[in-house]
C-alpha cells in the first residue's frame, strides 16, 4: 500500500500549475403527474409542465462563488418524459439532469438543500406538484467484471499557491 505525501496529476494545462478545480455533481430531478389522453388534458397532470416550472424556478437560484474557481454553475443537460414517445398522452413522469459545478466546502447536503427547499415550496403552492431531487448514480464495470456504483458527486478542490507543496513544485 502506497501513501504518498503528494500527487501530481498530468492533465492538459499548458504546463501551468493548476491549484484548484471545480467539482461536479449530477442532480436527478423527477416530476410526477397523471397520465391522460391529450384530447382531454384536464383529466391528467402534465409532468413536463411541472418540470418546466421547477427548472424555471431553479434558474432564479444564485450559485455560490469562489474567488479563484468562479461560480458553482447549475445547468440542465437533458430532459425526457414518460411515456416516450408520448403520442396523444399527457406525460405522467419527467426526468431531467442538472450538471452542477461544485466549489470547495460544498457537501452533498448543501448542494441538494436549496433544490429540495424549492420543491417543498412548489408542492405547498400547487397541490398537483410532486417532485424529488437526488444525485444520479453511476455504474461502472471493473477489469475483474465486478460492477461498482456510486453517486455522481465529485468535490471541488483548491490549494493556496503559498502552500509549501505548491512552492516546491514552482521552485
Residue locations for each model-derived region?
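Metal-dependent amide/peptide-bond hydrolase catalytic core
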Residues: 28-171
Amino acid at each position: 500500500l502506497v501513501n504518498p505525501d503528494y500527487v501530481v496529476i498530468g492533465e492538459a494545462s499548458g504546463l501551468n500549475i493548476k491549484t484548484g478545480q471545480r467539482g461536479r455533481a449530477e442532480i436527478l430531478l423527477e416530476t410526477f403527474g397523471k397520465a391522460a389522453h391529450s384530447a382531454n388534458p384536464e383529466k391528467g397532470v402534465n409532468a413536463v409542465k411541472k418540470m418546466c416550472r421547477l427548472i424555471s424556478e431553479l434558474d432564479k437560484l444564485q450559485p455560490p462563488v469562489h474567488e479563484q474557481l468562479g461560480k458553482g454553475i447549475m445547468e440542465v443537460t437533458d430532459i425526457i418524459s414518460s411515456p416516450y414517445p408520448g403520442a396523444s398522452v399527457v406525460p405522467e413522469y419527467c426526468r431531467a439532469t442538472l450538471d452542477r459545478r461544485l466549489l470547495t466546502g460544498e457537501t452533498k447536503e448543501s448542494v441538494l438543500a436549496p433544490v429540495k427547499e424549492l420543491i417543498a415550496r412548489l408542492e405547498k403552492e400547487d397541490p398537483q406538484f410532486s417532485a424529488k431531487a437526488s444525485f444520479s448514480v453511476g455504474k461502472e464495470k471493473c477489469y475483474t467484471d465486478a460492477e461498482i456504483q456510486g453517486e455522481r458527486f465529485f468535490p471541488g478542490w483548491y490549494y493556496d499557491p503559498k502552500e509549501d507543496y505548491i512552492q516546491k513544485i514552482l521552485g
